[in-house]
């Protein structure tokens, strides 16, 4: 039996990964992390989506220690979430240092326990906010370290790594779940489900990608298929 663990936040990217994993694996587990993030709604949305989409199990892990160590606008109410600014330089205040290091490591431990061969994460280099822990080289390096440390060939999969946001929308549409992604996920840094606040960087990327996809569906669907190998 093929099993996978999806690092699951209930946002657009991880939900798209879950939808695809449910078609490609016999058994899919979701793991969500409570790190004292700004909006508890993220966890509630993830739980509802995992159940409605048909995940085998959904585990919520308490990692609130990260909140004590990582200062970010996603972990501190006193730090405002910035609006989208295409000219901003440096790491945005929404970067949570060490988050993906911790999440992927803990997801690998969970994968070990449920005998899953893959840990799936929705990180992406094409449309990202400069986060260093979303880079392909980081994921591959950590995968190598985790496999050595566990003496087990767990595989990190990054289905969205080379897709832009329009192509990520196309992938959801390919699996017949575009409306689920649009209306039921929570990507907004201000904690608003669906189309979100429309002002933060996450909402900007999401809305811009959807507009691009709707403007040229055939070409973008074809590009997505070419990158992913889907027929």
Swiss-Prot record:
GO biological process entries: queuosine biosynthetic process
Protein name, entry field: 7-cyano-7-deazaguanine synthase
Role according to the record: Catalyzes the ATP-dependent conversion of 7-carboxy-7-deazaguanine (CDG) to 7-cyano-7-deazaguanine (preQ(0)).
HAMAP family in UniProt: QueC
Details of cofactor binding: Binds 1 zinc ion per subunit.
The reaction(s) this protein catalyses: 7-carboxy-7-deazaguanine + NH4(+) + ATP = 7-cyano-7-deazaguanine + ADP + phosphate + H2O + H(+)
Organism of this sequence: Cronobacter sakazakii (strain ATCC BAA-894)
GO MF annotation list: ATP binding; ligase activity, forming carbon-nitrogen bonds; zinc ion binding
Annotated residues for binding of ATP: 8-18
Gene name for this UniProt entry: queC
């Amino acid at each position: 039996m093929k099993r996978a663990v999806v690092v699951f936040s209930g946002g657009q990217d991880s939900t798209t990964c879950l939808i695809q994993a449910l078609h490609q694996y016999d058994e899919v587990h979701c793991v969500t992390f409570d790190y004292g993030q700004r909006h508890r709604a993220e966890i509630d949305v993830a739980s509802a989506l995992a159940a409605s989409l048909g995940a085998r199990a959904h585990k919520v892990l308490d990692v609130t220690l990260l909140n004590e160590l990582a200062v970010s606008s996603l972990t501190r109410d006193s730090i405002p979430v910035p609006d989208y600014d295409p000219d901003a330089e440096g790491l945005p205040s929404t970067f949570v240092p060490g988050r993906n290091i911790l999440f992927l490591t803990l997801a690998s431990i969970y994968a070990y326990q449920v005998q899953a061969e893959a840990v799936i994460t929705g990180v992406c280099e094409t449309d990202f906010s400069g986060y260093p822990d979303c880079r392909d080289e980081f994921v591959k390096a950590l995968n190598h370290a985790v496999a050595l440390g566990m003496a087990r060939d767990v595989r990190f999969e990054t289905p969205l790594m080379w897709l832009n946001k329009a192509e990520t929308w196309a992938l959801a549409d390919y699996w017949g779940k575009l409306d689920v992604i649009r209306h039921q996920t929570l990507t907004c840094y201000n904690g608003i489900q669906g189309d979100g606040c429309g002002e933060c960087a996450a909402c900007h990327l999401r809305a811009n990608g959807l507009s691009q996809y709707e403007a040229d569906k055939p070409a973008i669907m074809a590009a997505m298929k070419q990158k992913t190998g889907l027929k």
